[in-house]
């Protein structure tokens, strides 16, 4: 999995993580796609690192909104989407 794949899948989520409100269906589809692409521990760690980079590079991200995304979409992501997540511990 590449950061390009992660960022293109999660582009529809940017307005939600900045401003809240309803999560767009395209955003949930993107989270599902990333989760399905990240099948191995190495892929999950790579996706985690990409998410950390993305959340740090987008101004105005609300960390609570970012962390709530998987639950709001009904997707089980095995780590918290947060700039402080230690991706090395992701299994």
From Swiss-Prot:
One of its GO terms (biological process) is lipid transport. Disulfide bonds join 3-50, 13-27, 28-73, 48-87. Keywords: Allergen, Disulfide bond, Lipid-binding, Transport. The keyword Magnesium does not apply. Plant non-specific lipid-transfer proteins transfer phospholipids as well as galactolipids across membranes. May play a role in wax or cutin deposition in the cell walls of expanding epidermal cells and certain secretory tissues. PANTHER family: NON-SPECIFIC LIPID-TRANSFER PROTEIN 2-RELATED. This is Non-specific lipid-transfer protein 1.
């Amino acid at each position: 999995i590449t950061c390009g794949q992660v960022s293109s899948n999660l582009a529809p989520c940017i307005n939600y993580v900045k401003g809240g409100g309803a999560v767009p269906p395209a955003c949930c589809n993107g989270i599902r796609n990333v989760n399905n692409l990240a099948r191995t521990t190495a892929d999950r760690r790579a996706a985690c690192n990409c998410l950390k980079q993305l959340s740090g590079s987008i101004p105005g991200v609300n960390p609570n909104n970012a962390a709530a995304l998987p639950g709001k979409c009904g997707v089980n992501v095995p780590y918290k989407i947060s700039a402080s997540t230690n991706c090395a511990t992701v299994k």
